[in-house]
UniProtKB/Swiss-Prot annotation:
Inhibited by disulfiram. CDD domains: ALDH_F2BC (cd07142). It catalyses: an aldehyde + NAD(+) + H2O = a carboxylate + NADH + 2 H(+); acetaldehyde + NAD(+) + H2O = acetate + NADH + 2 H(+); benzaldehyde + NAD(+) + H2O = benzoate + NADH + 2 H(+); 2-phenylacetaldehyde + NAD(+) + H2O = 2-phenylacetate + NADH + 2 H(+). Component of the floral volatile benzenoid/phenylpropanoid (FVBP) biosynthetic pathway. Catalyzes the oxidation of benzaldehyde to benzoic acid (BA). Capable of oxidizing a broad spectrum of aliphatic aldehydes; increased carbon chain length results in a decrease in its efficiency. The gene is BALDH. This is Benzaldehyde dehydrogenase, mitochondrial. It comes from Antirrhinum majus (Garden snapdragon). Homotetramer. Induction: Circadian-regulation with peak levels occurring from the late afternoon hours until early morning and lowest levels during the afternoon in flowers.
């Protein structure tokens, strides 16, 4: 489809996972699941996939780390080891950057006709689509997110991203600019060179697409550092990229840890560009390391504490469902999650009761079990951090409506949790929890909620639920956020730019805007002798 939208997948498919007693059309069949609180946790289901690639990808070859070290990637359902993956460090980053530099300076990729790059990217997208179920299963196993979500939402998103950026490959061009005097002035849009990219664990492949797609479309080479929690899916799809004809050295993947591999990539003098998605604290370090090395430009997509505002004229049932999705999707592990739910005082009590009931109906269990809306959190650190915030909320005076504890005794499952009577100065209303914890705050006036919504160091996204066009128009302009969703949430498209205000980041990813991250603009001025019409 010419205008296939991510939002159509999210708005049609994901909400079906969030209606108790309804049918889910995610997965290969049609499944029915009940309205009991949370699914009983059983022994983990054997994943329908095996780990084939656990080494570093450097110069087109899968290789061991120079140190010979490996680290375990764990199954969030049990805490057990899935595989031991090569642990890259500074020496491996040096090898990967050298390969990327040679591929850029001497290889065919930046010099080949743009439509040839386009063909390779399209072949890659076709191969991932062909292997959709295998890639989705590996993603679900390593991250803990529901397989159905991966298979029917995230992998199709990934494919769409590469088809979108393939379409841009042969449409990048400069301008001819009229200037004073007898001169011909033009601009050249040139690939920036070697791009260093660091992706997070919450959407490993989607973030791969956001970063690698535009970089390659512009003719750059890439060194990608994966998150240590979720290294497997990137290695699998990189194999498919080389099957599609990607030249050696154009894409290099190093699995490892931030203080060793990540820091080495950020400070490397032969890296021309950095892109990072992760926490605000780490983003500051990335920016500092760039500044202290070669001042390479940096794109940052960082934390968020996004408001979801339910106005007094809202259809409460629809607002409850959308607010539930805005917060709980992906186990609450979304940088743009609607994690501050502001509800008008006239509908507050009704909203709280229905939000509690909806959370109680949320199905939580093994990601490979049909109909699961929520799997485990990604790892023990994230699990413990979320439980600590839940305790903080209860201790600070918020009302715990439901949830508030771990689910089962094995793995990193947390009960869907809802707090009411939340105040702006509570930690659960200020900090990015990154988990299944909904905080519901009351407001009275429009100006008041705008002020409170903007009173945050973050500015990644916001949501507004209203039937009043004037209210919507006021909100979309007043809210200090990179994305404002009106009567929807988490509506994504490859063409829609994404990024934050304030401490939520620098720059934009996705869409035409993202291409600018990976291009240098060169002005060329040529003196003219006796021009015919100047």
């Amino acid at each position: 489809m010419a205008a296939h939208r991510f939002s159509s997948l999210l708005s049609r498919s994901v909400p079906l996972l969030s209606r108790g007693g309804k049918q889910s059309y995610l997965g290969r069949g049609v499944y029915r699941y009940g309205t009991a609180a949370a699914a009983a946790l059983e022994e983990p289901i054997k994943p329908p996939v095996s780990v084939q690639y656990d080494k570093l990808l450097i110069n087109g070859q899968f290789v061991d780390a120079a140190s010979g070290k490996t680290f375990p990637t764990l199954d969030p359902r049990s805490g057990e080891v899935i595989a031991h993956v090569a642990e890259g460090d500074a020496e491996d980053i040096n090898r990967a950057v050298a390969a990327a530099r040679k591929a850029f300076d001497e290889g065919p990729w930046p010099k080949m006709p743009a439509y040839e790059r386009q063909k390779i990217m399209l072949r890659f997208a076709d191969l991932v689509e062909k292997h959709n179920d295998e890639v989705a299963a590996l993603e679900a196993w390593d991250s803990g997110k529901p397989y159905e979500q991966c298979a029917q939402v995230e992998i199709p998103m990934f494919v769409r991203l590469f088809r979108y950026y393939a379409g841009w490959a042969d449409k990048i061009h400069g301008l001819t600019i009229p200037a004073d005097g007898p001169h011909h002035v033009q601009t050249l849009h040139e690939p920036i060179g070697v791009a260093g990219q660091i992706i997070p664990w919450n959407f490993p492949l989607v973030m791969f697409g956001w970063k690698v797609g535009p970089a390659l479309a512009c003719g750059n080479s890439v060194v990608l550092k994966t998150a240590e929690q979720t290294p497997l899916s990137a290695l699998l799809v990189s194999k498919l990229f080389h099957e599609a004809g990607l030249p050696e050295g154009v894409l290099n993947i190093v699995s490892g840890f931030g203080p060793t591999a990540g820091a080495a990539l950020c400070r490397h003098m032969d890296v021309d560009k950095l892109a990072f998605t992760g926490s605000t604290e780490t983003g500051k370090i990335v920016l500092e390391l760039s500044a202290k090395s070669n001042l390479k430009p940096v794109t940052l997509e960082l934390g968020g504490k996004s408001p979801f505002i339910v106005c007094e004229d809202a259809d409460v049932d629809k607002a409850v469902e959308l607010a539930h999705f805005a917060l709980f999707f992906n186990q609450g592990q979304c940088c743009c999650a609607g994690s501050r739910t502001f509800v008008h005082e006239k509908v507050y009590d009704e909203f709280v009761e229905k939000a509690k009931a909806r959370a109680l109906k949320r199905t939580v269990g093994d990601p490979f079990k049909a109909g699961m809306e929520q799997g485990p959190q990604v790892d023990a650190d994230q699990f413990e951090k979320i439980l600590k915030y839940i305790r903080s909320g209860a201790e600070s005076g918020a009302t715990l409506e439901t949830g508030g504890d771990r689910l089962g005794t094995k793995g990193y499952y947390i009960q869907p949790t809802v707090f009411s009577d939340v105040k702006d100065d509570m930690l659960i209303a200020k900090d990015e929890i990154f988990g299944p914890v909904q905080t519901i705050l009351k407001f009275k006036e429009l100006d008041e909620v705008i002020r409170r919504a903007n009173n945050s160091s973050y500015g990644l996204a916001a949501g507004v639920f209203t039937q009043n066009l004037d209210t919507a128009n006021t909100m979309m302009r007043a809210l200090r956020a990179g994305t404002v969703w009106i009567n929807c949430f988490d509506t994504f498209d490859a063409a829609i730019p994404f990024g934050g205000y304030k401490m939520s980041g620098i720059g934009r990813e996705k869409g035409e805007y993202s291409l600018k991250n990976y291009l240098q603009v060169k002005a060329v001025v040529t003196a003219l002798k006796n021009p015919a019409w100047l």
